Amino acid sequence: MKNKLITIILLLLNLSYSQVYTVGDTAPSDFGLPWCGNNTTGNDSLFLMDFNGTLNETGRPYVIWIMSFTSWCPYCEQEVPYTQDFYEIYADSGLIIIGMGSDWGQPYTCEGWVENFGLGYPIISDLDTYNEYEYGGQGMNLFTDTYVPSNIIINHNMEIIYSQSGFDGEAGMNNIFNIITSALDQCYLCTCSELLGDIDHSFSNEDEPIIDVIDLLKLSDLISSDDQINHCERGQGDFTGDGLLNTIDLFAFATMLAEGAFNN
């Protein structure tokens, strides 16, 4: 009953999406589809807002790559190993890859697709394939109305910066690689260092981080302010390792500074 209710909610949400979102458009953060593979969250559905730094709980933005595919598509099978390679390189650097599959059972189930290609990134199930659309399902028709594989890249501001259908071999994958690396380079919060104590990101002439009383003062300001603390600041200031920033972290930081723990 719970799964049926979630499906109905997703259907109602997506009825409002009549346009094809393309390059330059802002991707709809409330768009989501049911998880079907590599669900590590315990949630029934994955939404784009989970990776929107202005809406999610951590404040961490992501660069998002959506690959739309069908289980019968030979070109999708040729492309998918590249997606796993990208995932293994950039999973910890702010890239989220989402496989959006449809037409399951021809021949792969969702689980079979994940297992056969050894995928580690999330797979969602596109809904209503061919029921309301000439081709593909809700998700595919939100971003394109052509054919698979279809690749959409969304930057940390939730702007679509790339949208293309078809598999263009290694040359096409190299192009996607360049677009993704450029997008990550433009997103400090996607790839920032979470070095403990490095709050103000100052460096010596030898490019070594300088951790001193200025960092302590900035941590104090963060703790006393009402501003949202992003994931970088949380990692850099969480001296107790409890996932929170409070006066205990401030005291621990001050003690370590006094003891010379950060002296080179």
Feature-to-residue mapping (PLM):
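Thiol/disulfide oxidoreductase modules built on the thioredoxin-like
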Residues: 117-119, 127-179
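Structural microenvironment flanking redox-active thiols in thiol-disulfide oxidoreductases
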Residues: 75-118, 129-137
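N-terminal "domain-start" segment that seeds a small globular fold
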Residues: 18-56
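Loop/turn elements at helix/coil->beta-strand transitions in domains of secreted/extracellular proteins
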Residues: 59-65, 91-98, 117-122, 148-149, ...
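Short active-site neighborhood of thiol/selenol oxidoreductases, capturing the structured segment around
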Residues: 47-77, 83, 97
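Positively charged n-region of N-terminal signal peptides that target proteins for export
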Residues: 1-4
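Hydrophobic h-region of N-terminal signal peptides that target proteins for export
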Residues: 7-18
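Cellulosome-associated attachment modules in secreted, modular CAZymes
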Residues: 185-264
